[in-house]
């Protein structure tokens, strides 16, 4: 697998697509950004490999927070990476929930080859378990969502 070079124009265009994709929890829009052998790493899910595994992980996430969306704050890039700072938010257990993250992306043929998410999971986990109205949904999706 060859990693694509990244310049400011590519980073800007990708950040716009990322922002558009996250305006609504539409799994098909997310899938359109992924390479077949994408690798996704984030604090609560560990590492997920392949488009099918990512599809399943995102489906569980959207089942837990059906109105999940993101607001992009900034974008940066290196020679072969894009960094996006954003806030994810939605409704869980009848109340708003939000957390900040920074993701690092690498690309193959213009599609995401690797996505590494950086965020402090502790406040998010405390909110998830601290809202009894969401426990049923958490019980149905949480074990699989947080499994490693």
Pin down the residues of each PLM region.
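A solvent-exposed, acidic/Ser-Thr-rich amphipathic alpha-helical stretch
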Residues: 27-79
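Short beta-strand segments enriched in hydrophobic/aromatic residues
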Residues: 34, 88-90, 119
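Short, low-complexity N-terminal intrinsically disordered segments enriched in polar/charged residues
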Residues: 1-32, 135-148
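Short beta-strand edge/turn micro-motifs at domain boundaries
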Residues: 103-129, 135-137
